[in-house]
Amino acid sequence: CVLCYRAQSVDRILYLIGSFEFKGIEDFEKSFEKSDFGEWLKKHKKFKVECLRLGSHDFKSVDIEKRLVNFINKKYKNAKFGMKLYEIIFFVHIINNNCYVGVDFAGFELNKRAYKIFLHPNSLRATISYALAKESGFQKDEVLLDPFSRDGIIPIEAALYANDFPVNYYKKDRFAFLMLNLGVDYEKLFKGIDRKIIKKSKSGIY
């Protein structure tokens, strides 16, 4: 939950429940047996499935989504699939011939920022901009000068880092983990993190 709220260098935050290698699409249903869906479906009956693929395959992401939905519906009779009404998101991440299955804690792409309203044609991804700021060796009490700032993504990401400002401060109500029964007081969690925001940073960012 904390990573979803604060992390600047990630696209997704998943709780891993299974992983396997495969040769073809026919391997998936048997391999899904290795993933612990049951523990999560005890508390969350309505589910959604998403899939993201990297690499060349003879199937589409939607094919894997359908197979996982069918697998869960067959094995867990009380579970119900829903595109809009759901309590938990099972996310399938495929990289070449490796598959990772997890619970999506964010529910949206964490590389997208609330401050990016109008995009520059050559705008960098926020995650890359943060990585560049860190790669430069920038520290929280130092000065950062970006003479080629364009739409200012690198300085903005550096400022968020320098002030310990949660990158998803304005998306508190959008997280998928808010629907999960984790026994966490989310309001208290957010307030605890927000209290650590540095009001007046010692760094200079231009």
Give the residues covered by each predicted segment.
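Non-catalytic nucleic-acid substrate-recognition regions in nucleic-acid-modifying enzymes
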Residues: 1-85
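Short loop/turn segments at secondary-structure transitions that flank enzyme active sites
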Residues: 55, 98, 107, 153, ...
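A short secondary-structure junction signal
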Residues: 60-61, 112-115, 157
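SAM-dependent Rossmann-like transferase core, predominantly class I methyltransferases
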Residues: 101-135
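C-terminal edge-of-domain segments
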Residues: 90-106
